[in-house]
Every structure is written in structure tokens, then in C-alpha cells.
């Protein structure tokens, strides 16, 4: 990663993820939307169980990326999230509840085929996320990325 700090991943996400959300809103099939609904319901049911919530949350976002219909984007979004997860950030149950609400709003935009709204939702979410992590974890955000800390499957390095 050539000494790239974790904050650079959030910068990349802010550029890339709104476009992915817009593509998902444009290209999602009814089957993909049904899959997103299932992952959202699972995340909502698992808010108090962080590992189970994390699995459903990750599956939802992988589903959004898959809904673009572009296999590169379908791989890129989970990879960016795996890099972010290498920071070891564990959201509280209250924050997980907020995330489910945002996932629900995004799903509505995708279902409506509203690419601009889907992009705006993700841009706002990424911006808030970056501000929160930078304020709460400045040392982690400045720390260079290391492959040894990245897990694509969400099970940890």
C-alpha cells in the first residue's frame, strides 16, 4: 500500500461508492432487490449480535455492489470495505440501528431506480463515517495499511 493511511481508503470510498450506488439503482433486478431486502431484514434482526450483524451488513453491501451488474464493481466495494474493516472499528448497537435505517433508505432509492438519490445517500453516509472515525480514532486513521490486517471474508486476519 506504499504507506497509505487508512484515511486514504475512506477518501477513495467517497469517490467510488456513490457511483456504485447509482449504478445499483439503475441496474438492480427484482431478484437483486429481494436479496437486498433479505439481507436488510437479517441485519435488523441481528443488531444486538455484532458478529451476526456484521455478516448481514457485509452481505447487504456486497449485494448492492452486485446489483450494479458490473463484476469489477462487485469486487471493488467489498475490497474497499475489507480495507476499512482492517482498522478494527466495531460499531455500537445504537450505531448499528442507525446503519439499518440508512440501509433502508438506500434500498428504497434503489427500488425506485433513483440513481441520484442513491448516490447522495452513500455520499452522506461516507462523509459522516469519515468524520466519525477521524474524530474518534485519529491514530488508527493515520496508521498505514498492512495486508496482514486485511480480511476479505470478514473473519479477521
Model-predicted regions and their roles:
Residues 15, 67, 79:
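Conserved catalytic core of Hanks-type protein kinase domains
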Residues 40, 44, 55, 79-157:
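C-terminal all-alpha effector/ligand-binding and dimerization domain
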Residues 31, 71-72:
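Cytosolic histidine kinase catalytic core of two-component systems
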Residues 23, 67-70, 83, 128:
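Phosphate/oxyanion-binding loops and surfaces in catalytic or ligand/nucleic-acid-binding neighborhoods
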Residues 69-71, 113-114:
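Short loop-to-helix capping motifs
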Residues 1-63, 101-124:
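All-alpha effector-binding/dimerization core of bacterial HTH-type transcriptional repressors
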Amino acid at each position: 500500500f506504499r504507506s497509505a493511511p487508512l484515511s486514504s481508503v475512506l477518501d477513495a470510498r467517497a469517490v467510488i461508492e456513490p457511483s456504485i450506488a447509482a449504478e445499483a439503482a439503475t441496474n438492480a433486478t427484482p431478484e437483486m432487490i429481494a436479496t437486498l431486502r433479505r439481507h436488510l431484514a437479517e441485519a435488523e434482526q441481528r443488531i444486538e449480535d455484532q458478529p451476526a450483524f456484521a455478516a448481514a451488513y457485509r452481505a447487504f453491501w456486497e449485494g448492492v455492489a452486485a446489483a450494479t451488474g458490473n463484476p469489477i464493481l462487485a469486487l471493488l466495494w467489498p475490497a474497499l470495505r475489507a480495507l476499512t474493516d482492517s482498522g478494527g472499528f466495531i460499531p455500537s448497537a445504537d450505531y448499528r440501528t442507525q446503519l439499518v435505517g440508512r440501509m433502508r433508505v438506500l434500498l428504497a432509492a434503489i427500488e425506485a431506480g433513483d440513481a441520484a438519490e442513491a448516490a447522495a445517500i452513500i455520499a452522506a453516509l461516507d462523509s459522516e463515517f469519515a468524520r466519525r472515525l477521524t474524530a474518534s480514532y485519529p491514530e488508527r486513521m493515520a496508521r498505514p495499511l498492512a495486508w496482514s490486517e486485511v480480511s476479505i471474508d470478514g473473519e479477521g486476519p
